[in-house]
Amino acid sequence: MRANKIVYTSNTGFTRRYAEMLGKAAGLPVYDLAQSPQGGSALYLGWLRAGKIHGLARARKKHLVTGCCAVGLTDRPPMEKLSAQLPEGKVFYLRGGYDHGGQHGLNRLMMTAMIKSMERRPPEDAAAQGLLRAAREGADFVTEEQLSPVEDWLRG
């Protein structure tokens, strides 16, 4: 195993669901970052905000992060940008979802502004149209199938 635990930070539950699925499949304990015991190697799962993997810096201070799953809404992840955030480990992307009602404070303000900005210009293709619809109405793209490469890497 390339990690002895799974640690996550979740905002609206999509990342937590992936962490729990991975823990069950790999037989590893799963912890919310805030409650995780310090030390040991970890696969970290964090949600994306403005291209940054939320909580990764804190996870790296507390654990040896050997791999990371960035969970986001788009079907076109910026893998170079994501991989640069953990150059010494493996970075995966999992398409999660969006729940506007679950957003609060700054996150809600940022997403509301992003939706308004997207609405001002016509979507350039079907993917952009789908992203706008998901942001407006909410969406859930969590699937076990997306975890296959992560499970293979964990078994290493």
Question: What does each model-identified segment do?
Answer:
Residues 1-61, 152-156:
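N-terminal beta1-alpha1-beta2 submodule of the flavodoxin-like/Rossmannoid cofactor-binding fold
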Residues 34-107:
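Helix-loop-strand module that forms the ligand-binding subsite of alpha/beta enzymes
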Residues 13-16, 100, 144:
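Loop/helix-junction capping segments adjacent to catalytic residues or to phosphate/diphosphate-binding pockets
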Residues 113-156:
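Glycine-rich phosphate/pyrophosphate-binding loop and the adjoining helix
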